[in-house]
UniProtKB/Swiss-Prot annotation:
This is UPF0060 membrane protein PA14_21660. HAMAP family: UPF0060 (MF_00010). The lineage of its organism: Bacteria, Pseudomonadati, Pseudomonadota, Gammaproteobacteria, Pseudomonadales. Its main location: membrane. NCBIfam families: PRK02237.1. The chain crosses the membrane at residues 5-25, 27-47, 59-79, 84-104. It is a multi-pass membrane protein. It is found in: Cell inner membrane. GO terms for cellular component: plasma membrane. SUPFAM superfamilies: Multidrug resistance efflux transporter EmrE. Belongs to the UPF0060 family. It comes from Pseudomonas aeruginosa (strain UCBPP-PA14). Keywords: Cell inner membrane, Cell membrane, Membrane, Transmembrane, Transmembrane helix. It comes from the Bacteria.
Length: 109
């Protein structure tokens, strides 16, 4: 279960880092947004290495589902746009898939 905590923290750091660049490059905010963006993206990379997985690719694949879910929470609470029901359905499918990837090796032993 600790893996999910690392995934969630990493996801919000990645989204925040990318959003900082979005603020600068797409919304015309100050280039100083790059600094917290780089810090956040570095923290994202460090957090993702905390996940217990035999292979990096498997950890990244499982992380993808959590990232999709975190993105919708970001959409709702930071950008203040209401996700559609189909967005939540997609998230549910992604999280189920991520769980299969993460726990699959334990089930196949």
């Amino acid at each position: 279960m600790i893996n999910y905590l690392w995934f969630v923290l990493a996801a919000f750091c990645e989204i925040a880092g990318c959003y900082a660049f979005y603020l600068w490059l797409r919304l015309g905010k100050s280039a100083l947004w790059v600094l917290p963006g780089l810090l956040s993206l570095t923290l994202f990379a460090l957090l993702l290495t905390r996940v217990e997985a035999s292979y990096a690719g498997r950890a990244y694949a499982a992380y993808g589902g959590i990232y999709v879910a975190a993105s919708l929470f970001w959409l709702a609470f930071v950008e203040r746009s209401r996700p559609l029901w189909s967005d939540w359905l997609g998230v549910a499918l992604c999280v189920v898939g991520a769980s299969v990837v993460l726990f699959g090796p334990r089930l196949s032993q």
